[in-house]
């Protein structure tokens, strides 16, 4: 697993967001996902770059996955990447408790960082947003990428709020997307 400083040095490169394939019956196609990650890693090895790979971002359809499906996708990604590039797992959920649970799991299986959107159904106040990320930071040793996406979260984290957030979380925040 990378240190936060090493991750910070890689997040200003290309961020590859993996897609999650599904079977026609709606079940996650884990074998297809594994193939996709292997293909991506092979191309990165052929053409080395400063980059990260993110499972379970928006392109990975994270809101449509169960917690167990999200965890399995993250585990497979970390396993297949095998340290070739940093894995920044998408771990955002509709609640702080579930976000922390998925994020702790991602850390436990070897993800280098997490990418986290605000809870997206009941949008928190500014104080709630600060508390959400502070609670998450307190639970993790790995770096956090703040996914500032008002189209999906219903809220925009303004620069002054981001400054306060960085003060609250120490060096845990490695980037903002």
Name these PLM-found stretches:
Residues 161-177:
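Active-site/ligand-binding-proximal alpha/beta "capping" segment
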Residues 2-156, 173:
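Active-site beta->alpha loop and helix N-cap motifs at the rims of alpha/beta catalytic domains
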């Amino acid at each position: 697993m990378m240190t936060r400083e090493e991750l910070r040095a890689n997040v200003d490169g290309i961020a590859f967001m993996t897609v999650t394939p599904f079977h026609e019956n709606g079940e996650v196609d884990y074998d297809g996902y594994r193939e996709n990650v292997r293909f991506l890693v092979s191309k990165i090895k052929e053409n080395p770059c400063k980059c990260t790979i993110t499972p379970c971002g928006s392109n990975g359809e994270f809101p449509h996955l169960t917690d167990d499906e999200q965890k399995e996708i993250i585990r497979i990604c970390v396993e297949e990447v095998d340290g070739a590039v940093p894995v920044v797992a998408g771990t955002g959920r509709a609640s702080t408790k579930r976000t922390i649970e998925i994020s702790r799991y991602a850390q436990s299986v070897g993800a280098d960082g997490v990418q986290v959107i605000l809870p997206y159904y009941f949008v928190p106040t500014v104080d709630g947003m600060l508390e959400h990320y502070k609670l998450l930071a307190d639970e993790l040793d790995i770096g956090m990428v703040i996914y500032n996406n008002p189209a999906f979260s219903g809220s925009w984290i303004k620069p002054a709020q981001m400054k306060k957030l960085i003060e609250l979380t120490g060096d845990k925040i490695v980037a903002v997307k």
